[in-house]
Amino acid sequence: MKHPQSVCYEIKTNLTPERLETINKYGCCAFVLLWCLGIEPDDLQAILLVNDMMNAGVIEKDCTVHWAEACRFLTGREMAVEFKDIKSLYGLKDRTPVRYDYKGKSHWVGVVRGMIGFNPLESSQCVEKGRPVSARLLKLK
């Protein structure tokens, strides 16, 4: 434990119930981006970091990620982002954001060495019943 009261104050002043609900429902992509960049704070700090990214405009109010801008915000480095349609996880070696789709819904997970290495949810129907459809290949410029 470090400064729980300070964290409580930060949450109260920076996260409206609406913002927290948006991050809860749609923040998977942002959390996966953090993981793929090797940024692995505790869960509370991750939520606060996503909120900071929204305030900075590198993530939209609906949690849509502006990939290159978000990478620069988080790392201070320029990154190229390639959008790639996929049908399987095969061949994805480095940490890669991957979107799964199922019945009109989507969910993002982090993949490494062809396997899911990080899922921001304990379980997801999109992952369990759906299929991978899209990846974001992140490369330092």
Which ranges hold each PLM region?
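Conserved active-site-adjacent core of cysteine acyl-enzyme catalytic domains
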Residues: 34, 38-141
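Active-site-adjacent structural segments surrounding the nucleophilic cysteine of cysteine proteases
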Residues: 1-59
